[in-house]
Amino acid sequence: MIPKRRHNMGRATAVATLLGSALIAFPAFSVDLTVARSVDADGLDPQKASTTQSLQMTNLMFDTLLTMDKDGSVHPGLASAWSMSDDGKTYSFTIRDGVKCHDGTTFDAAAAKASVDRALNPATINPNLSSWGPIKTTSVDGKVLKLTLSEPYGPFASFLTSIQAAFICPSSVAGGEFKPIGTGPFKFVSWTRNDSLKLEANPDYKNVNPLITNPGKPHIEKLTFKVIPEAVARMAALRSGEVDMVEPSLEEAADLKADNNFKVYAAELSGQQMLAAFTWKIKPFDNPDIRKAIGMAMNRDAYASIAFEGLVNTANCPVAPNLFATDEALCATWGVKYDPVAAKALMAKAGYGPDHPLKIKLLVHKLPGWDQMHQIMQQDLAAIGVDAQIETREVAAFFDYMKGVNAKTDGEPAVWTMGMSGVDPDYLYFLWKQPGFVNMGLNADVDKMLEEQRKLSGDARAAKIHQIEKYLMENAYAIPLLSPGWGWLMASTSKVDGFKMGFMVSLIFNDVTKS
């Protein structure tokens, strides 16, 4: 079964739909919006940024070559049309006419080439360099940017929609010191680190992003982000009217959701996925039946409704919803379902039960909602004869620790939880191809499938991704839990309308008005 939605790639050239002359009613007065954040950006260079907080800011000032709709399909962006050669190695992007950089200079194919060249330059130290794929050469032919790859790379179009693939203007790097000059909906005004970032609407902006309704410049004239680290202080600022929007805690979001004076926004298109995984090289987790029993014991509905206040959804696939080829109904036929009775039977067959429990570690890291989920999970496992002792670490230390744990072939078995995000299911390659993320890679057969999907496109690639997902699910290497899962909440006063959150937890203010 292949989902009907697919990338508009292939031999034919994809062309943008004309915006036409639809009339939009714009507010007749200047509208300012202030947003309180817990953490500041660590930089405003999209080709060097690595944190969500930084990329959320760069996404407001810089555009991408392509865009993605909520169904995972790829659409025009800075490129009004694009095509792929028959061998899948050469991409041609026609740069849209009339695009202006924030300083008034023209953004054309030469500017686009310069941006790609800088992103690929090792001296840039781009944390997302590998995601650009095997680009061999870049060239310009009139209005067309040509990118030639050494081999086909299926995720390429999806990556070019992501906030990590933003295009900068040449004037950004003129003179040596980086200046945030892009083509995006907002222009840089000022930045005082760990205090405030001020932006203003780009009067020349023309939107083609399918997630946005407003065809022109944002309704918001001035957009200010204030850093308020303390959650109590952020909420006080929201309730007093000092700010219009905040990053709420999970508990605060639940309270605000019940109050008509406020609105809560969850990043449904986050591309985030929460998984449970195993130290599968250590007995008895080398036995797929034991892994399946663990998965059957996990009550994902309870995790969503109790630990996450009903603000997230349960997941069936090892890839996040809304991404290319994701089919939650199909994945549900491959994976385990909540069935503690069947789980007990599998454990009993392996010799485990109340009088002889399987002792394991539940290795986790600290995040809002996750802590309570792990406590419920511990109870779920106890109900089938598994004695799970929770060990909690900070995020950075956790993944360093897991790299060592997953390399072991003996010792105490462990279940561990993690999250992954992206705009394409190719992150399966990052996770599972040997040696894999924190040494969780599997085997040569999986490696081969992961390599093959990168060289395919359209229905053929979707079928290969489904084959990979089916293998992971039927062998219970991954237990999908919930989506989304971190940094995915925003709240505003009821006076704010039109705010959206896009892929990779991007913040979309183009349609925002304030009464």
PLM feature spans:
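Structural transition elements
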Residues: 186, 313-349, 367-372
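Ligand-site clamp/hinge motif
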Residues: 208-256, 387
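N-terminal lobe/hinge region of extracytoplasmic solute-binding protein
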Residues: 37-86, 117, 181
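Aromatic- and charge-enriched surface segment that lines or borders ligand/interaction sites
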Residues: 80-125, 143-146, 284-286
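Detector for C-terminal structural segments
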Residues: 32-33, 192-197, 297-326, 368-380, ...
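A structural "hinge/loop" feature
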Residues: 40-55, 78-79, 105, 127, ...
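Surface-exposed binding/hinge segments that line
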Residues: 94, 128-169, 185-192
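Gly/Pro-rich hinge or "lid" segments in bacterial periplasmic/extracellular proteins
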Residues: 160-224, 232-233, 341, 345
